[in-house]
Amino acid sequence: KFGEYSSIFEFIQNAIDAKIENKIPLVKINFDSIKKKKFESLITKEFIAHLENSPRVKNLSETLNDEEVQTLILEDFNTSGISGEPGTWGLKTLDGKDNPIFRFNNCIGVEAKLEDAVLGGSEGEGRQTFCHASEISTFFYHTIRHNELNKPLMMGFAYL
């Protein structure tokens, strides 16, 4: 509905929801052009085949032929990062705890994720805005979890 702005609103809400206790979350928002060479390895033949078959992706050949890609870069600080076990397939980790990273990457509208819906983010649907703001319906993210600073993650998903 609001294009890139919806993803910015969602991002800010997520940063507030993930604030580290007694710290004010900070956000940095930037529109930038990035040379395609920086992330060409992420755009595989298999991925392109999926994009070609998606009704959501428009102007694919034009987008893929551009030497620079317009990006929306969203950064947050004083937040917990996306916790959980990325290699565990399920809403719970192997030790029975919630698995937010699985929910973020794989679930849309699967039961309430927060006990207090007033905080926002209670339905698990807002993350779709990141893909809707993308011409190739794709979103990449880098997360540094506050309890695992030495294990940053680079992940992404496409809403095809």
Regions found by a protein language model. Name each.
Residues 2-37, 41-62, 126-131:
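Conserved ATP-binding N-box helix of the HATPase_c
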Residues 6, 21-25, 83-87, 141, ...:
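N-terminal switch/interaction subdomains of large nucleotide-dependent motors and GTPases
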Residues 36-38, 81-83, 148-149:
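Eukaryotic short linear interaction motifs
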Residues 46-51, 91-96, 159-160:
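Short, low-complexity, polar/charged sequence segments that are solvent-exposed and flexible
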Residues 49-54, 142-153:
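Extended, regular secondary-structure scaffolds
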Residues 55-145:
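Flexible ATP-lid and adjacent glycine-rich G1/G2 motifs of the Bergerat
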Residues 135-138, 151, 160:
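Extended, Lys/Arg-enriched charged tracts that mediate electrostatic binding to polyanionic substrates
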Residues 155-157:
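An alpha-helical interface "stripe"
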